[in-house]
């Protein structure tokens, strides 16, 4: 599929256009037979995708920040498809495309709840896209994460399950090279976790 019309042309002493697809959208378009049309739609869309949110960030906090860029018609919180709890992303629908571009211009890489959020133009929300697509019900990016992040559920899937290695290989009889790679599940760490000894309370968000 040719995406020549979306190739970025760089000029000296110029600023980057906002109504251009991100590298993620370009990769997605190349795998999708209808990708070119979706790219064109996203460039004139009133919808944005917001990623890397804390699981504890509420819809009210998102509205307070993003309403500074225009009139918000709807916010769709991303949910774990099994637990129906927030899983770190959302869609925001503005009343016109210019307001979506305002959000992209002024709020990209902003910190919300101590997380640097990402913003991307979106072709438009469809029912079903609010659910995580990962094996555990959340986002795929969290399942590929190896570090502990309290704002995004702590550890994701145990290391052994992610790489497909039987748990028996991580017992006391395993070789040193194997045990060095083991990442314990959250319940194996006890109640004290360095840097996270004060647990944040779960919010009372109820998906509408």
Curated annotation (Swiss-Prot):
Further comment found in the protein's record: In contrast to metazoans, where the CBC complex is involved in the nuclear export of capped U snRNAs, it is believed that in yeast, U snRNAs are not exported from the nucleus and U snRNPs are assembled in the nucleus from RNAs and imported proteins.
UniProt-annotated stretches for the region Disordered: 168-208
Feature: compositional bias, Polar residues: 171-182
Biased composition (Acidic residues): 198-208
GO MF term set: RNA cap binding
Locations listed in the record: Nucleus; Cytoplasm, Perinuclear region
Subunit-structure text: Component of the nuclear cap-binding complex (CBC), a heterodimer composed of STO1/CBC1 and CBC2 that interacts with capped RNAs. The complex interacts strongly with the importin subunit alpha SRP1. The SRP1-CBC trimer also binds to capped RNAs, but formation of the importin alpha/beta heterodimer upon binding of KAP95 to SRP1 in the cytoplasm causes dissociation of CBC from the RNA. The CBC complex is part of the commitment complex 1 (CC1), binding to the cap of pre-mRNA and interacting with U1 snRNP subunits MUD2 and SNU56.
RRM domain span: 46-124
Residues binding mRNA: 24, 49, 118-122, 129-133, 139-140
Entry's Gene Ontology cellular component terms: commitment complex; nuclear cap binding complex; nucleus; perinuclear region of cytoplasm
Entries under InterPro entries matching the protein: NCBP2, NCBP2_RRM, Nucleotide-bd_a/b_plait_sf, RBD_domain_sf, RRM_dom
Highest taxon above the source species: Eukaryota
Descriptive protein name: Nuclear cap-binding protein subunit 2
Lineage, top ranks: Eukaryota, Fungi, Dikarya, Ascomycota, Saccharomycotina
SUPFAM superfamilies in UniProt: RNA-binding domain, RBD
Family classification: Belongs to the RRM NCBP2 family.
